[in-house]
Amino acid sequence: MWTEFCNSAEDVTYQVFPRLAALAEVAWSPKGHKDWYRFVKSLDNYLYLLRSKGIRYSEAMFNIQHKAVAENGKVKVTLECERPDVAIRYTTDGMEPDISSPVYTAPLIVDHGGEIRCATFDGTGKMGKTLTLDMGWNLATGKEVISPNVSDKLLTNGVRGSLKQSDFEWTEWYTPKDASFTVDLGKASPVSRVVLGLSLIHISEPTRHLRIS
């Protein structure tokens, strides 16, 4: 356990629990008897024990992962959670999801800007954190990106990346050569302004030259 980013004992327990339970499951379960779905369900009793002892632990297993893909002028948003026994509920009006919100059963097809909020729920209420996707919309949103760099396709999915690389919304060019990509608008369209967003952190720097053709 590397503790350079931990400022208290609670930070340490947050990092190691329930990961220690997963490590024990892998080490102690006989070969051929490892069952992910049984394990995550059995964690409920273990987490109850941690709470009763006042031990802070991570609830990341209840958080939602997303994938937003530009497709035929729209954006397909896929949501998933590590826990198979919870329901993902969502809203598209900017309101916080609750137990009465629609249940996610299939990818959401987005054709305009707005805010999607989603969270996981079980029989007792909300679990984990709310995922908020602020869907921006412009002439390029939902359009095809032609580029050898697979991550460039994120440029037109309407979701802006955060400072956390784990949001999977980063587009990166680790090359000394110029980065080049084409956004296919599908037809001749007037363009009044082009904006390129950059996260100015220690491993990136703004472009020196930008050519649009």
Task: Describe each model-derived feature in a short phrase.
Residues 96-104:
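Short beta-strand segments within Ig-like beta-sandwich modules, predominantly Fibronectin type-III
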Residues 106-113:
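Solvent-exposed segments in extracellular or luminal domains encompassing
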